[in-house]
Regions:
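DNA transaction DNA-binding modules
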Residues: 324-449
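Conserved catalytic/switch belt of AAA+ P-loop NTPases
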Residues: 230-253
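Conserved AAA+/SF3 P-loop NTPase catalytic/coupling segment centered on the Walker-B
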Residues: 215-237, 272-277
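AAA+/SF3 P-loop NTPase mechanochemical coupling elements
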Residues: 206-211, 246-264
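P-loop NTPase catalytic core of nucleic-acid-dependent motor ATPases
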Residues: 101-211, 366
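Long, low-complexity, charged/polar intrinsically disordered regions in eukaryotic proteins
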Residues: 304-337
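A short helix-turn-beta junction within AAA+ P-loop NTPase domains corresponding to the substrate/partner-engaging
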Residues: 271-292
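N-terminal nucleic-acid engagement/recognition segments and initiation subdomains in replication
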Residues: 1-127, 142, 146, 377-382, ...
């Protein structure tokens, strides 16, 4: 680990630093990387200025260096000034100076969010159960409290343990102007740690848009997703790292995720009807009219409140008595909330209605495709797979009662050999219309489930 860059240094003149450098026998300063490092560490302008930011994975200049600049990140103009400074020592090899800068920065690495979180002192007042009501008018109940706690602790853990498993998205649902996006921006503490620039997941630069950010808002992205894109979003949220190379690198490297994702939407039916589960998305309805304050009424006070919110979360994190998931009982509450925000599943409704009036003992996916959904063509594989998901999920959730999946495939008069579903207590009548086939035959036919 690097020595503390804040330790007291005796200011050294250029002549003092020259005395520290290795020289040729004729007294000329050697143009080595090590001499460049010595200059960068001891020159009164450059000493303690160059550090590697572990959040952005970029090199920062963290103190005034005597030339006009904006922002912290080292840029091309900074390099020109540094090269000019190094010429005072008779060194002008840009390649060696750049190598020395990377070494010095790496030995003086820091993480701005870790430093911020570790500096906080909690005043002992609980804010996690109340913050979403305070600023956004959300319900003050156990579900909202647990959702907020999971999100905060997930964000903290991602910073201290980059790449940890955390695939939960807190989704704020409410009218325009409620302050949803502003809440997440202020929650990120610094605007540079927040981003709402992630619009497409198929963008070649999508992973670079995560770099240097802590909280990333995905506004309306879920609400506009189709069946294919929602799977892409779920897969994207589940990733723990990205692999790519930045311009100065020769080889790609793994970048462990340090960010979390937040959703905002105005739509009440923003969740797609996902029959395999929407566990990653935690919807929280908000109502600005019920909020105690609008988050921008007094931004300074709001930021102070949020600072104490993080201090409270850090206290919980340091104790270690937390989980980044709902309890089984609260998971049921989550599923009930998700149902309130799900889009209508027309196909499932048609199949459920068909089964209510159906008098037969067995059905298969092709039969439901034709008779329940009214299609006359031969279904594609993905269409039969979708019907299988409707049936199997409906049975497991109790939406479809009195039915169970076949243990073996059976031959249907109109539809051939199919796997399907049968009534749990079926009479013997009509059984002669079906005949069982072996598991080998079923495997050979390649059924969708």
């Amino acid at each position: 680990m690097s020595k503390e860059v804040n330790e007291e240094r005796t200011p050294r003149t250029v002549e003092d630093v020259k005395e520290m450098l290795t020289k040729h026998s004729n007294g000329e300063i050697q143009r080595t990387i090590q001499n460049c490092i010595t200059i960068l560490q001891n020159d009164h302008v450059l000493a303690d200025a160059i550090r590697l930011n572990l959040l952005s994975e970029r090199i920062d200049i963290v103190k005034p260096v005597g030339w006009p600049r904006s922002g912290k990140t080292l840029n091309d103009t900074d390099m020109k000034y540094i090269l000019r400074r190094m010429e005072k020592y008779g060194i002008s090899s840009e390649k060696k100076i750049e190598s020395a800068i990377r070494i010095v920065a790496n030995e003086n690495r820091y993480h701005p969010i870790r430093d911020y979180l570790n500096s906080l002192k909690w005043d002992g007042t609980e804010r996690i159960p109340h913050v979403l009501y305070h600023f956004l008018g959300a319900a003050e109940d156990e579900y909202t409290c647990e959702a907020m706690k999971i999100f905060l602790l997930g964000a903290i853990k991602r910073v201290f343990q980059p790449g940890c498993k955390f695939e939960t998205m807190l989704c704020l649902v409410g009218g325009q102007g409620a302050g949803k996006s502003t809440f997440f921006r202020l929650l990120a503490v610094k605007d540079e740690w927040f981003s709402d620039d992630l619009r497409r997941l198929d963008d070649d630069n999508v992973y670079r848009k995560l770099q240097g950010h802590w909280i990333i808002e995905m506004s309306e992205m879920i609400a506009t997703a189709n069946a294919k894109s929602i799977e892409e979003i779920k897969s994207f949220l589940s990733k723990q790292k990205e692999t790519y190379k930045v311009p100065y690198e020769t080889h790609p490297a793994d970048r462990l995720r340090q960010c979390v994702f937040a959703g905002t939407t105005n739509r009440q039916d923003f969740l797609p009807r996902d029959r395999t589960g929407n566990r990653r998305f935690i919807p929280i309805p908000v109502d600005a009219e019920l909020a105690e304050v609008h988050i921008l009424d007094d931004e300074t006070e709001s930021r102070t409140y949020i600072g104490q919110l993080w201090a409270e979360a850090m206290t919980i994190y340091n104790r270690g008595d937390y989980k980044l998931a709902f309890s089984p009982a609260m998971q049921e509450t989550l599923q009930a909330h998700q149902q309130d925000f799900m889009q209508e599943d027309a196909q499932a409704g048609m199949i459920y209605a068909f089964l209510e009036d159906y008098t037969g003992d067995r059905v298969c996916s092709k039969q439901l495709y034709a008779e329940a959904l009214g299609n006359t063509n031969i279904p594609a594989e993905w269409e039969t797979r979708s019907i299988c998901e409707i049936m199997n999920t409906g049975i497991s959730r109790g939406d479809i009662q009195g039915w169970q999946a076949h243990k073996t495939a059976k031959r249907y008069p109109k539809y051939g050999v199919q796997k399907g579903w049968e009534r749990v207590t079926s009479p013997e009548t009509g059984a002669e219309d079906f005949s069982e086939i072996t598991d080998a035959e079923a495997k050979q036919l390649g059924f969708p489930f």
